[in-house]
Amino acid sequence: MLTHEQIRAAKLVDNCLKDKIILVTGAGDGIGRTVSLFYARYGATVLLLGRTQSKLETLYDEIEALGYATPAILPMDFAKATFAQMNELSLLIQKEFGYLDGIVHNAGILGALTPLEMYDPITFEEVMKVNFTAPFMLTQALFGLLMKAKSASVIFTSSSVGAKPRAFWGAYALSKQGLEGMSDIFTQETQNHTTLRFNTINPGATRTNMRAHAFPGEDPNSLKTPEEIITPYIYLMTDDASGVKGQVIDCQPK
């Protein structure tokens, strides 16, 4: 089994994602945006899913201008999305591409940083829907397309508060704990009779808008950029990582 350090230091060859069809959620901002750009750079056709059409269009234009494979724009707000809409999305991808090589579940919201005894139930429900329930529904809706690929890879995005719950992080921490458990269960249910692989990535402290909102007094220049922690996201989508299953991988040494 590869160590986290080996995965972080993996050598990536040009076009290592050539001809792969990969869906990235939360593609309009932060880590999702960077992941999408790098996947395109390494040869993938990227399906850009996010809630803000204008941000997806800007990213689409950027990928096109760089001469990479033409991406697709898939607007969807996880806070409002239904399972029926996700099934419609699956049919659309089936018609256009026929299969799906991977999903990066990156979309997420922070919610409130407050004691659970004071946590607004409506906010709690929204955070759990966006961060936990929607990734489950989307994975289930796209499962058949993943099975049609040679060796599909699903990546969930966790957090340090997913591995170790922390006071005041409420629904966000609980949703990330849930994702790590979901990845583990999917792995146990598929690893012996399919080529599917499920893993979770903990990006660590990264220079994003969400991080700035959670830690407003923190110097952003003290943090790694998404570009600096990108290697595990790319490696786990390559065929070389076909044996990596059920892992929670830290992008930054602890």
Residue ranges: model-predicted function:
Residues I21, G26-G30:
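Conserved glycine-rich cofactor-binding loop
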Residues L89, T114-L116, D120-E125:
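Substrate-binding pocket helix/loop in short-chain dehydrogenase/reductase
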